[in-house]
């Protein structure tokens, strides 16, 4: 019988990984590094990237199930046809990612590698990888604010609080923000209000934008209700 390969752990997910797995992990890292801001204003955190490399957020993604509604709700427009009618789909998506970067946004993953279907439950992944994420936040990302995305990150929110990040968490009534879903107007209103509630800082570098709305504008987005 042929012996099982003795694979080393992947530093992205902590699990034994084949050379093919490591190569894909490095490719995802390369894609995300292209759009990482020098100073991260809002760090969005989701559980894991898409299963297909072609659908990686920073690819940019071929599938728009997450990509399009996420950037739409951040009011990063898809394309100005009058200004540049010749742009193709890839160029348009890349321009949106560049604007995402320009605003100081960054999307990070608890597990930097996809979680296979029928893999471990989210709670297990969170318990296993949260110490690594917390180290990355503290010593690498150093964001001004953290916005967890997805209700499956419930236990991660508590761990981030215990780690001392409570004052910079952007939440919905104490919970992680809902993950993007196409056509869900209620989610879009909720997400916009939560991110818009992040107060501006006086020490933002030149050209560094963030969502800043007045109370009146916030009420208008919420349908005119206070």
What are the roles of these predicted feature ranges?
Residues 139-143, 196-204:
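Secondary-structure boundary elements
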Residues 132, 178-180, 193-194, 207, ...:
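Low-complexity, intrinsically disordered/propeptide-like segments
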Residues 199-226:
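Extended, charge-rich low-complexity interaction segments
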Residues 1-169:
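A polyanion-binding, active-site-adjacent surface
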Residues 72-80, 165-198:
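Short, flexible loop segments at boundaries between secondary-structure elements
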Residues 14, 176, 225-226:
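Compositionally biased, intrinsically disordered low-complexity regions
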């Amino acid at each position: 019988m042929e012996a099982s390969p003795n694979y080393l752990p992947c530093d992205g997910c902590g699990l034994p990984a084949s050379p093919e797995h490591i190569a894909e992990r490095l490719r995802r890292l390369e894609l995300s590094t292209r759009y990482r801001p020098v100073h991260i204003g809002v760090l969005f955190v989701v559980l894991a990237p898409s299963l297909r490399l072609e659908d990686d957020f920073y690819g940019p993604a071929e599938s728009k199930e997450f990509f399009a509604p996420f950037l739409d709700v951040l009011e990063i427009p898809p394309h100005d046809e009058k200004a540049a009618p010749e742009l193709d789909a890839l160029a348009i998506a890349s321009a949106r990612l560049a604007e995402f970067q320009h605003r100081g946004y960054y999307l990070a993953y608890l597990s930097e590698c996809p979680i296979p279907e029928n893999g471990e439950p989210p709670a297990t992944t969170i318990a296993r990888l949260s110490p690594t994420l917390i180290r990355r936040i503290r010593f690498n990302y150093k964001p001004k604010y953290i916005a967890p995305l997805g209700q499956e990150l419930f236990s991660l929110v508590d761990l981030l609080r215990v780690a001392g990040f409570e004052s910079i968490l952007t939440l919905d009534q104490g919970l992680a923000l809902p993950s993007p879903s196409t056509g869900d107007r209620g989610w879009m209103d909720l997400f916009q209000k939560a991110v818009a509630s992040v107060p501006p800082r006086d020490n933002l570098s030149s050209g560094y934008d963030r969502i800043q709305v007045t109370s009146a504008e916030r009420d208008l987005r919420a349908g005119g209700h206070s």
